[in-house]
C-alpha cells in the first residue's frame, strides 16, 4: 500500500493535486482502493474521472502484485481526513476530531478547534484547554463540519 501511495501521490502532485488519503480495504466479496483527492479551489467530477483513468493505467503495471480491486476516486468531503501536518495547518481555526492510538486521560477521542501544527505536533483547543498531539500518536483525524461554518 505504501508503494501505491508513493506512486499515486507523486503523479497527482505533478498535476497540482493532493492525495489526501488512500485506503485499500476488503469490502463484500472484493477489494476497494479508495483515493481521496483535493486541489486548490476544490476537485471536480472531471478531475476525479481523470485521476481514475490515470491512476488505473499507472497501477496496471503492478497488476501481478495486487489482488483484483475496484478503484474509487472522490473529494475528501466536508469531514475530510487530516493525515499530514500541512493539512492541520491549512485548517487552523476549524473544528476537528482527533482519535489517538492509545488512550489519554481515559479516552481516545478529542474534539476541538485546531490551533497549531509545527514540527510534528498538533495543537487542539478543547473546552478552552490546549492539548498537544504528536502526529505519530494520532490514529485518525477529521474535520467536523458545523452548519454555517465556512468550508474553505
From Swiss-Prot:
Instruction: Answer whether the UniProt record assigns the keyword Cytoplasm to this protein.
Output: yes
Question: Where does the UniProt annotation locate this protein?
Answer: Cytoplasm
CC annotations in GO:
cytosol
What's the superkingdom here? Bacteria
Q: Does the keyword Cytoplasm apply?
A: yes
Q: Pfam families, per this entry?
A: DUF150_C, RimP_N
Q: Where is the signal peptide?
A: none
Ordered alphabetically, the record's keywords are: Cytoplasm, Ribosome biogenesis
Gene Ontology biological process terms, A to Z = ribosomal small subunit assembly; translation
What family name appears in the similarity comment?
Belongs to the RimP family.
**HAMAP family for this protein:** RimP
Record's function text: Required for maturation of 30S ribosomal subunits.
PANTHER family from the entry? RIBOSOME MATURATION FACTOR RIMP (PTHR33867:SF1)
Q: What is this protein called?
A: Ribosome maturation factor RimP
Q: Which organism is it from?
A: Desulfatibacillum aliphaticivorans
Gene name as annotated: rimP
Amino acid at each position: 500500500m505504501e508503494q501505491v501511495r508513493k506512486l499515486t501521490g507523486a503523479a497527482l502532485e505533478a498535476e497540482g493535486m493532493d492525495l489526501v488519503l488512500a485506503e485499500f480495504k476488503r469490502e463484500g466479496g472484493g477489494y476497494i482502493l479508495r483515493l481521496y483527492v483535493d486541489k486548490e479551489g476544490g476537485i471536480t467530477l472531471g478531475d476525479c474521472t481523470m485521476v481514475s483513468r490515470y491512476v488505473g493505467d499507472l497501477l496496471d503495471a503492478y497488476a501481478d502484485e495486487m489482488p483484483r480491486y475496484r478503484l474509487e476516486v472522490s473529494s475528501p468531503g466536508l469531514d475530510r481526513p487530516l493525515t499530514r501536518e500541512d493539512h492541520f495547518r491549512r485548517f487552523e481555526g476549524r473544528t476537528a476530531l482527533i482519535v489517538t492510538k492509545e488512550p489519554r486521560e481515559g479516552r481516545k477521542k478529542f474534539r476541538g478547534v485546531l490551533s497549531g501544527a509545527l514540527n510534528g505536533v498538533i495543537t487542539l483547543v478543547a473546552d478552552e484547554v490546549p492539548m498537544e498531539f504528536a502526529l505519530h500518536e494520532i490514529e485518525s483525524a477529521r474535520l467536523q463540519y458545523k452548519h454555517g461554518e465556512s468550508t474553505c
